Design a protein with these regions (language model features):
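Helix-terminus/linker motif at the lipid-water interface of multi-pass membrane proteins
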Residues: 25, 29-47, 116-125, 181-188, ...
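N-terminal transmembrane alpha-helices
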Residues: 4-36, 40-41, 57-69, 73, ...
């Protein structure tokens, strides 16, 4: 082990982790506030926003996968002390993200009504009208979202996660205030919810792009790199992004299929599952926040050719993830009875929610640090195909098929689906932990 192992002190790691965690927590809390405000716009607006967000998530995953691929490449070049190459990679990521997202937006704007009727054709006319309005406005924000993700990848790669946190604070304040004005003052219905999101995302995209041009940063954008196509850099980014995007795409499709299975159960089980998922999202914040940290740290170590340092930080980051996840999941579970006071649910439904949260949180603390956060470290080392194959096979063969077997055949309902979910995590956790211990990930080359 050489001096690279001292590159990331405990203080530096915490300076990366805490802003990422707070940013994710803020996004979650603002999302809950948005849901509350949207409910005052009417049931059609609530339904329209909910359905379109399922559709939007597909593209959000694609933009996130692209940014993650960029973050891996940027981190590795930083580790190799080739900051100009890191900057050119970041600039190429910006160019490709902008072009790709504009094409997606144009496609959605042209075919939005047909797409929605194909996916949600049986909904009422008022709901469909809300869907079309919300999707059309949302599509205009795709380029802003992709451009922001590209800039966020740069800042996270250089360890300045506080930048994205502060931008997130400001943009979410804009979003919340805009929603209140749109819904309560202008009474614009679903448009009153959609336009503030467009404005907030555009603000974030413009601000982070301006900040990325500042030459005081370790890595920064340059116009000559943005407008000069470099096939080699894009191949490096897409080599990581495409498998990651395919993995996320399959996961999203399975989620849609699972929603169909849940719809077969009784009303109280559907309600319990919906409430539990909200609490699950809150409980999962610790593991989700650690993902970019693994990418930055392991990516820089491997870029420097120091596999021993990467091995060292795999252990350190995994321990931190386990500790934070365990404490956070325990706290959320203890607060669940308090959360239940805000829901008008039957006692039977509340008891089911608590059981679902218990199942989720135990395994989110014990298994997800390996199946989720640690797998990002493997990707940062270039071991992307293995993680993709394992994740796709496990998602389909374990989560989907086991949900059908336990939930429908054995009549376990949503409890069966929750068990299938944690079985998926556990299997991936064991495989990824074994993969990390095997050292096979040390043999890959990204740049």
């Amino acid at each position: 082990m050489n001096q690279q192992t001292t590159l990331f002190s405990n203080e530096k790691l915490m300076a990366m982790i805490i802003p990422l965690f707070l940013e994710q927590l803020l996004i979650m809390l603002v999302g809950m506030a948005d849901t509350l405000v949207v409910s005052y716009a009417g049931e059609a607006a609530v339904s329209g926003v909910s359905l379109v967000n399922q559709f939007n998530t597909i593209f959000i995953y694609l933009f996130t996968a692209l940014a993650s691929g960029g973050a891996v490449v940027i981190s590795q070049y930083i580790g190799r002390k080739k900051n100009d190459d890191a900057g050119e990679s970041a600039s190429q990521l910006l160019s490709f993200s902008a072009i790709f997202s504009i094409l997606i937006a144009v496609m959605v704007l042209i075919g939005n009504e047909g797409m929605l009727r194909l996916m949600f054709g049986k909904v009422e006319d008022s709901v469909m009208h809300s869907c079309i309005t919300y999707l059309r406005i949302s599509a205009y924000s795709y380029p802003a979202l992709a451009v922001y993700n590209a800039g966020a990848a740069l800042f996270r790669s250089i360890g300045k996660t506080s930048v994205t946190m502060y931008l997130s604070v400001i943009s979410n304040i804009i979003n919340v205030i805009g929603n209140f004005i749109g819904v309560f003052v202008l009474r614009a219905g679903v448009a009153g919810v959609a336009y503030p999101s467009l404005i907030a995302r555009t603000f974030s995209a413009v601000m982070i792009t301006v900040l990325c041009f500042q030459r005081k940063n370790e890595v920064f954008y340059r116009c000559k790199w943005i407008f000069r196509w470099n096939v080699d850099f894009m191949k490096q980014i897409l080599k990581i992004a495409i498998p990651n995007g395919m993995e996320n795409g399959v996961f999203q499709l399975v989620k849609v299929a699972l929603s169909g299975i849940v719809a077969l159960f009784g009303t109280y089980q559907i309600a319990a599952n919906g409430v539990a998922q909200s609490i699950w999202s809150l409980a999962a914040l610790a593991g989700v926040a650690m993902g970019p940290v693994f990418i930055t740290v392991i990516g820089q170590c491997m870029g420097n050719g120091d596999a021993d340092a990467a091995e060292h930080y795999f252990k350190i980051l995994t321990r931190i993830t386990l500790l934070i996840s365990s404490a956070w999941n325990l706290l959320i579970f203890l607060l669940t009875p308090f959360f239940m006071k805000f829901y008008a649910l039957q006692p039977e439904t509340k008891r089911l929610v608590i059981w679902l949260v218990l199942i989720h949180n135990v395994f989110n603390a014990a298994a997800y640090p390996f199946s989720g956060a640690l797998s990002n470290g493997l990707r940062a080392a270039g071991d992307v195909k293995f993680t993709m194959y394992v994740s796709v096979i496990s998602t389909i063969a374990v989560r989907l098929l086991l949900s059908w077997l336990l939930g429908i055949v054995l009549k376990m309902g949503v409890i069966g689906i929750a068990i299938a979910m944690v079985c998926d995590w556990s299997i991936r956790a064991v495989i990824f932990f074994w993969r990390q211990k095997s050292g096979k990930w040390k043999t890959f080359q990204v740049i």
